[in-house]
Swiss-Prot record:
The keyword Oxidoreductase does not apply. PANTHER family: ATP-DEPENDENT RNA HELICASE DBP3. It comes from the Eukaryota. The lineage of its organism: Eukaryota, Fungi, Dikarya, Ascomycota, Pezizomycotina. The gene is tif1. Keywords: ATP-binding, Cytoplasm, Helicase, Hydrolase, Initiation factor, Nucleotide-binding, Protein biosynthesis, RNA-binding. This is ATP-dependent RNA helicase eIF4A. It catalyses: ATP + H2O = ADP + phosphate + H(+).
Length: 396
């Protein structure tokens, strides 16, 4: 079928023309140090966009990916860029442009963290900082440079940011960038790059001006559309237990323990300190629990996760960091020892991917101070959290 113009597609959506999926990082044939960095960063398996977009980028295709934030897109292009560069070549080989300073700095942090074992230097070129500092940093030839369009264009024109070794040009949040009036700078940057530079464009929406960039500057691009997986509270019974004061939560949990271990449960606390404290207290009462949070070494987290997945550990105490990372499809009970500090995390803790259609029970410990937050959560998700019945064990 002839490639139909992207312009004909309905309401700013692109149509995928690439269906290959690589569902583990191990199968991506990444450099050993990079793979180590990916796992150390806390990833266990690739998200939908990572499964689809990393391989074509590594293989050298131009890629258009339509994906919302929260889908794992930053890591998608960071991993790809780290795989493609030669760390020993002191010259810019991958250039990433983002619409805001904050986003550029965030991307830089991700690149440095995932590239930790490759000793990669990644420089952020952003407005509002001294040009002198940029010039000095760029003279050292960092292999990956990330920045905002104005400053990047300026640095290339001054010949401080050299483009002769450039292999990869990544535009993140292209729709944002063009709607903020950076079109001219973006076009200028394209003109200043070597003809053969591979182009990767990421955008949540595909308005006309973004499509024009893809037609003008991209060669036969792979198109990937990733819809954000909708989490749902459907099929999940939500209860609360009124706890007069914080100190009583521990006894409440101990009373529930028999019920809890009928199946596997995840217990969420709001801080790492609380996770450690609760783990100690429960262990002292001879309850078997495992704990996991961001302060732990990745290898340790992997072991705990493996034990939990295999069912040899039944109760996992964790922080929100893991709410998004734990594939808790097999978990039918979640206890919020602390209500989440922000309501968005509530659905990450207890929600389920619609296609799994899993049943489940969530129990929220609620002190007088938490009532307002609970009402907010109910309103935000248009859901009902009811007082826990006596026969909760029958529902799990």
């Amino acid at each position: 079928m002839a490639d139909k113009g992207l312009e004909d597609l309905p309401e700013g959506m692109i149509e995928s023309n690439y269906e290959d999926v690589t569902d583990s990082f191990d199968s991506m044939e990444l450099k050993a140090e990079l793979l180590r960095g990916v796992y150390a960063y806390g990833f266990e398996r690739p998200s939908a966009i990572q499964q689809r977009a990393i391989m074509p980028i590594i293989k050298g295709n131009d890629v258009i990916a339509q994906a919302q934030s929260g889908t794992g897109k930053t890591a998608t292009f960071s991993i790809s860029a780290l795989q493609k560069i030669d760390p020993n070549l002191k010259a810019c080989q991958a250039l990433i442009v983002a619409p805001t300073r904050e986003l550029a700095q965030q991307i830089q942090k991700v690149v440095v963290a995932i590239g930790d074992f490759m000793n990669i230097n990644c420089h952020a070129c952003i407005g509002g900082t001294a040009i002198r500092d940029d010039m000095k940093a760029l003279q050292e030839g960092p292999p990956i440079v990330v920045g905002t369009p104005g400053r990047i264009q300026d640095m290339i024109q001054r010949r401080v940011l050299k483009t002769d070794q450039m292999k990869l040009f990544i535009l993140d949040e292209a729709d944002e960038m063009l709607s903020r009036g950076f079109t001219e700078q973006i076009y200028d940057i394209f003109q200043l790059l070597p003809q053969a530079t591979q182009v990767v464009l990421l955008s949540a929406t595909m308005p006309q001006d973004v499509l024009e960039v893809t037609t003008k500057f991209m060669r036969d691009p792979v198109r990937i559309l990733v819809k954000k997986q909708e989490l749902t509270l459907e099929g999940i019974k939500q209860f609360y237990i009124a706890v007069e004061k914080e100190e009583w939560k521990l006894d409440t949990l101990s009373d529930l323990y028999e019920t809890v271990t009928i199946t596997q449960a995840v217990i969420f606390c709001n801080t790492r300190r609380k996770v450690d404290w609760l783990t100690d207290k429960l262990t002292a009462r001879d309850f078997t629990v495992s704990a996991m949070h961001g302060d732990m070494e990745q290898s340790q987290r992997d072991i705990i996760m493996k034990e939990f997945r295999s069912g040899s550990s039944r109760v996992l105490i964790a922080t929100d960091l893991l709410a998004r990372g734990i594939d808790v499809q097999q978990v039918s009970l979640v206890i919020n020892y602390d209500l989440p500090a922000n309501r968005e995390n509530y659905i990450h803790r207890i929600g389920r991917g619609g296609r799994f259609g899993r049943k489940g029970v969530a129990i929220n410990f609620v002190t007088a101070d938490d009532v307002r937050m609970m009402r907010e959560i109910e309103q935000f998700y248009s859901t009902q959290i009811e007082e826990m019945p006596m026969n909760v064990a029958d529902l799990i």
